[in-house]
């Protein structure tokens, strides 16, 4: 009963409309959130664009330690279409180490883009978005008795952000969720998922991450989140992404409204500091920047080759001229003799 009550509070705070109707676009879209939810206009909002040349390396940042995430558990997990995202409940036996306090898991959910789009993540790294993003939500159970109490306190929540890109093969871990989406096609529908290792949803290596203070990315946008965004990415197949983009509806019945593009745009950093657990090996370039760099290098090489060619031609002509002069002088000397 206690867990069910906790789940309701999680749903109310992190996914429900709190008494107001909100969407990602249109008259109730994210540009208008601050009207009904003042904290959405705050100066410590999430998500953000992480510029790696501006982050601060902190050697004292301990590694994130997910406890219990690799255990299968005994109880099925609730999967819910709340009209804004697909949300999976997590048992309180899951918690994080490596943070200032004990943070207990509550739920996870996904953000993605339009059908056919490869840009649907909320956080960006060097202005580059990925196909989707997984958020794993925790609350400070050491200091507060409930998630609803912790949600309005500084660093009351801790959220793990996992960027998801498209790879060549399917990811079996994500199929635990994606294979059930047809059962919750419409808003407010729920189903059960057999217990599985939640850790398999994460990237294999968790040592490299970014850390900053931010907010919930949906109303009421409480500025109470200690964010950890992993540098390594998880991968799903194109078919799995299409299933995520094409299955769900944000409405309760037909005519249905596709549940797509459920991500908030990056918010101003406003002098906040982003810490990194690792030293950047070098500048990280976006695809466009890499393409521009490649074109620039090719153009430079072409100019260099042309310059060498013209210099060689000039030297060759000069040598030919000198040779003719020598021949002419020799012939003249012979005649005079």
Curated annotation (Swiss-Prot):
Subcellular locations according to the entry: Membrane
Enzyme Commission code(s) on record: 4.2.1.1
Record-annotated membrane-spanning stretches: 291-311
Activity control mechanisms: Inhibited by acetazolamide.
Glycosylation sites recorded in the entry for this protein: 213
GO cellular component: apical plasma membrane; basolateral plasma membrane
Molecular function per GO: carbonate dehydratase activity; zinc ion binding
Top enzyme category: lyase
Residues noted as binding substrate in the record, renumbered to the chain: 217-218
Entry keywords, A to Z: Disulfide bond, Glycoprotein, Lyase, Membrane, Metal-binding, Phosphoprotein, Signal, Transmembrane, Transmembrane helix, Zinc
Catalytic activity, reaction form: hydrogencarbonate + H(+) = CO2 + H2O
Disulphide linkage map: 40-221
Residue span(s) of domain Alpha-carbonic anhydrase: 20-278
SMART domains from the UniProt entry: Carb_anhydrase (SM01057)
Extracellular side: 16-290
Leader peptide range in chain numbering: 1-15
Pfam families assigned: Carb_anhydrase
Protein name: Carbonic anhydrase 14
Organism, as annotated: Mus musculus
Organism phylogeny: Eukaryota, Metazoa, Chordata, Craniata, Vertebrata
Gene: Ca14
